[in-house]
Amino acid sequence: MAATGINSEDRLVQATFAAHLKDKLGWDTVYAFNAETFGADGTLGRNDTTEAVLTRDVRAALRRLNPELPTPAIDDALRALTLHDFSRSLLQHNQEFARLIRNGIPVSWRDANGQRRDARARVIDFDNARDANRFLAVRELKLTGLPTPNYNRRADLVCFVNGLPLVFIELKAVYKNIRAGFDGNLRDYMDENVVAQAFHHNVFLIVSNGDRAKY
């Protein structure tokens, strides 16, 4: 959804989705629009609206899932998961991040004896998914373009797993054609000059009007 007024019926569908994630699936939920505070201790830990990854949650997950890794290795893994290369396309970013999420992030460091150590840092626990990961759904997340900072968009519902935006949900009022959500909104968001960084880690795109859904 672009940064304009929110139709009350659109908001009803959005609130219903968020309530289901919270009450039925155990997700944490946050309503961010005009309520988010920024900084390390802010609502989501973001420094500003160009950040699509919640680095505070990513760092916490890396530490939790890789207790044997020293801080420099954790820092390297976090950088690898948030690197934005303007010479690469959205698809290239997505493919690379998918490999890192699935296979682990290669890291190396020197131990106390000066010996090189190599490992792969996990950012998601696929074996104990429910208990070992943090699931957070954010409503009305404001995003600003990286190459063009004057492009501002407001995402209806973004679902984060350990701080990574894996699911992007565009919601419409029940009487609206869900195709419009893809053609009129998602295509715009994914433009390299708009907020493509929000889709670098994406696994699912969902459009729904509360009655029907496509992904």
Where are these regions (language model features)?
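An alpha-helical interface "stripe"
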Residues: M1-Y215
